[in-house]
Amino acid sequence: MTPSTSTPHTSTAPHTSTGQSTDGAAQPGDGSSAYEAGFTESASGRVYTVTGGDWEEILGAGEQDAERIVVNMGPQHPSTHGVLRLVLEIDGETVTETRLVIGYLHTGIEKSCEYRTWTQAVTFLTRADYLSPLYNEAAYCLSVEKLLGITDDIPERATVIRVLVMELQRIASHLVWLATGGMELGATTAMIFGFREREKVLDLLELITGLRMNHAFIRPGGLAQDLPDGTERAIREFLADMPKRIREYHRLLTGQPIWKARMVDVNVLDAAGCIALGVTGPVLRAAGLPWDLRKTMPYCGYETYEFDVPTALEADSFARYLVRLEEMGESLKIIEQCLDRLRPGPVMVADKKIAWPAQLSIGADGMGNSLAHIRNIMGTSMEALIHHFKLVTEGFRVPPGQVYTQIESPRGELGYHVVSDGGTRPFRVHVRDPSFVNLQAVPALTEGGQVADVIVGVASVDPVLGGVDR
């Protein structure tokens, strides 16, 4: 029987339509590709052939009218801001389709939190977005404090220091964006300048927290320790120098013809597109919408600080560059106000059932086992030692409930959904990372543009794959 051409099939008979032969139809044994995955043209239409195991090929056979090239960018590509894989379908130099592949940096951070105490979970979450670890710590600790009902009990000095270190971190993060973005566009001087100033910020954070990155400095109830001697002087020296550096960036890049040619009117995404995709942060503000959670939904007393929310209307890569530069200047204003507000006082809540020891000097090994620390724990009574042992090993209990807390990170809205079942460990911690959401905009930014502009588009979003994959 002659098979019908109305449905795909596998057969050893030639493909013909009922009552007539196929134009150019392949015959058995003629060595043609009719018996491989693909299609042939017949008088009644196109006939698809599947020989088994070739489904992936046949699914796209109908779209192969024109020649297409698929290019893999990453996951080891230096311009993908981490282990991000971009699968680009191109027609000449034009990108027709962009697909993102993530997950290469998954480390199970959220799941790991379920096997640690509420305080120990900070050491995992600070490693999610590794370019802004203090924001992960702050958002998580604010969530735990809401569940505990101690938000209003956090000492004023601890809250001010939290704002101080977060704004320092914002500057450091934007400087990494400037340096890596400059490197990807061939502006090596911008790379050198950006990392030069970032080193100064990391030196300040190391002075304050003991570590350059992954600080575990912000903890439920307050901070790990107070500011060491000389911190205020070092920060004020930085505040005096940094405005000159920002002006230097403007002189170097803002009017530079090649820099502008690569970024102006490139990777445009307007406010409506940002809202539809859930994009936040500098990308949204560069589209004209002044949405900044420090202003719209204040936390940590941000409503008492004076600063502006930089915006632009062009919604292109150059506008995102300008917004980030202006944000660094606004962060400097906030840091200066923090220094003026610092008053002596505790940096941890008074409730000893929650508070880990604070106000203690750190030993030479950085582990907090200085003589002052040991004397505070063991030099009082056996009951004090037992309490400390149980607090550290078992942790404190958090009442059952769930809470969602969002803050404004350097990349946008960073949200934490924290669930407690009444135990000493989190039942669930879910991170709404801005890089994960903002990456959804990359196809909208890049499709229809040039291959070279893909690098600009990804850089303008500024994703951190540690936060994306977690």
From Swiss-Prot:
It holds the Pfam family Complex1_49kDa. It is an enzyme of class 7 (translocase). InterPro entries: NADH_Q_OxRdtase_suD, NDH1_su_D/H, NiFe-Hase_large. Gene3D superfamilies: Cytochrome-c3 Hydrogenase, chain B. It catalyses: a quinone + NADH + 5 H(+)(in) = a quinol + NAD(+) + 4 H(+)(out). Its EC number is 7.1.1.-. Residues 1-37 are annotated as: Disordered. Transmembrane segments: none annotated. Residues 1-18 have a biased composition (Low complexity). GO terms for molecular function: NAD binding; NADH:ubiquinone reductase (non-electrogenic) activity; quinone binding. Coiled coil: none annotated. It is a peripheral membrane protein. It is found in: Cell membrane. GO terms for cellular component: plasma membrane. Keywords: Cell membrane, Membrane, NAD, Quinone, Translocase, Transport. Belongs to the complex I 49 kDa subunit family. NDH-1 shuttles electrons from NADH, via FMN and iron-sulfur (Fe-S) centers, to quinones in the respiratory chain. The immediate electron acceptor for the enzyme in this species is believed to be a menaquinone. Couples the redox reaction to proton translocation (for every two electrons transferred, four hydrogen ions are translocated across the cytoplasmic membrane), and thus conserves the redox energy in a proton gradient. NDH-1 is composed of 14 different subunits. Subunits NuoB, C, D, E, F, and G constitute the peripheral sector of the complex. This is NADH-quinone oxidoreductase subunit D.
